[in-house]
Amino acid sequence: MTGYELESDYGSMFDGTNKNCKESILELQFTNSTADGTFHKHVLHFWVAPGSMSGWDEIRVSDMMYNEFLKEGRIAEGNMYDARAYGSMMFDDPYYYEGGHILGYNYDDIYDENSATRYNYRKYMPSTWSDYAQNYVGTNMPLMRYANVLLMKAEVYNEQGHPEKAIPLINEVRSVHGKLPAMTGSDQAAVKAQIEHERLVEFTLENSRFYDLRRWGKLDEAMKADGRTGFSASTHSFLPIPLMEIQTNNEINE
């Protein structure tokens, strides 16, 4: 695939400042403008924001997700965690103590010892408080990014028994988006584990996790770990075939 590149500022793809960038292959289009008489806005920013920001605190960063973001430690440029952590969530870190990195505010302006959680998603919040404070916002939602192409290609190479071809693709995403050094490990199992980690931190809140887990055969394990005991991968992995299709096509076997 040509004509696309990874965007160096990961968070800008989700805060409305870098719509339809060089990495974007397909994204849902929203706008704050109502000049044409139409309304193309959403309220996802309120779903992810904590109550202290007048948010609904409904879509939270899980403990698992938080730990995954920080699991490699401060190995990124500037002695930071994976840069995607800062583009995806607000958490207790010196980066957020000053400089107004939370829509012009600092960590202690948003959280105190009584906060229900000490971390929330930053992804899909607009870049400024004035935009955030609107009831509806016009930030776009990426559906397919070039990073996904690279990591899918890496996964294919690895499944074909060529981890050496997958590693440079993984490292490209790590370097540009995470500001991270090259991955460690070189065998097929290590590369598979790295791909699973990269996809989790790269595409959080981008609707890929269910399909990744299904492809890897890990849906039951993940759902049970989250307390979803009523889930069964054999029953719930795919949507049912519409009855009309079954009735009109004798070749369909339920």
Please place each PLM-identified region on the residue numbering.
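Intrinsic disorder/low-complexity segments enriched in polar/charged and small flexible residues
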Residues: 49, 58, 68-71, 131, ...
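Residue-level signal for threonine
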Residues: 61-62, 70, 242
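Short, cationic low-complexity segments
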Residues: 44-66, 109-113
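Active-site-proximal alpha-helical segments within enzyme catalytic domains
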Residues: 65-73, 149-151
